[in-house]
Amino acid sequence: MPKKFQSENTKSAAARARKAEAKAVADAKRKKETEDAFWQDDDKHVVRKEHRKEEKEKKRLELLERKKESQRLLDEEDSKMKGKPTKPAAPSKVTRAQIEETLCKEEKHKDAPEKPKTHLEIPLEENVNRRVLEEGEVEARTVEDAIAALSIGKELDRHPERRMKAAFTAFEEINMPLLKQENPNMRLSQLKQLLKKEWMKSPENPMNQKYATYNSH
C-alpha cells in the first residue's frame, strides 16, 4: 500500500508541473501579445505626432514665405513712390495706331490757321538780325544793308547761296507780317507760298538784281 500511494503522488506532481508550465506559457504569450499591442499603438501615436509636427513646420515655412513676399512688395512700392524703381522699366511699345494718331495731330496743328497779330505785336520798325559771317559779325537794318554787308569781299562772292539766304530771311521778316494782316484766314503754308511768289519777282532778290544789272549793260 505505501508504494501505491507514493506512485499516485508522483503522477499528481507531474500533472501539476505540466499544468503550471502550460499556464506559464499561456501567460507569457498573453504578455507578449499585450506588449506587442502596446508598442504597435505607441508606433501609431509616434507616427501621428511626427506627421502633425511636419504639418506644423510646413505651415510655419509657408507663413514665413508669405511674410517675406509681402515685405518685398511693400519695399518695391516704397521705392516706386520715392522715384527709385527696384529695376529699370522696360521701354513701352508704341503701336501703329498711336503713331498714326500722333502724325494726324501734328498735321492738324501744322495746317491750323495762325492767329493774326495785332498792331501791338507788330514792331513799328523792322530790324534785321545780326548775320554771322565767316570772318565776323555784321548788323543790318534794311534789306539793302544786309545784301551790301554780305556782298563785301571776294571770299563772300564764292558763296552766293549765303547772300541769297540772308536776303530772303530779311525779306520774310519784313513782308510775312504784312501778308498775315492782308490774309488772316490763310494757313501758314499758303502764306509761305505767297511770300515765295513775291520773292521771285521782288527787286530785293539778288537774282533779280543780277539780271537787272546784266540787262542794263
Swiss-Prot record:
Disordered as annotated region, ranges: 1-123
Source superkingdom: Eukaryota
Primary residence: cytoplasm
Pfam family for this entry, one: Ccdc124
Coiled coil feature spans: 41-83
Basic and acidic residues bias locations: 18-45, 52-74, 98-123
GO biological process: transcription by RNA polymerase II
InterPro entries associated with the record: Ccdc124/Oxs1, Ccdc124/Oxs1_C
Keywords tagged on the record: Coiled coil, Cytoplasm, Cytoskeleton
GO cellular component terms, semicolon-separated: centrosome; cytoplasm; midbody; nucleus
Record function comment: Ribosome-binding protein involved in ribosome hibernation: associates with translationally inactive ribosomes and stabilizes the nonrotated conformation of the 80S ribosome, thereby promoting ribosome preservation and storage.
Assembly and binders: Associates with translationally inactive ribosomes in the nonrotated state.
Entry's family note: Belongs to the CCDC124 family.
Full protein name: Coiled-coil domain-containing protein 124-B
Naturally occurring in which organism (per UniProt): Xenopus laevis (African clawed frog)
Gene that produces this protein: ccdc124-b
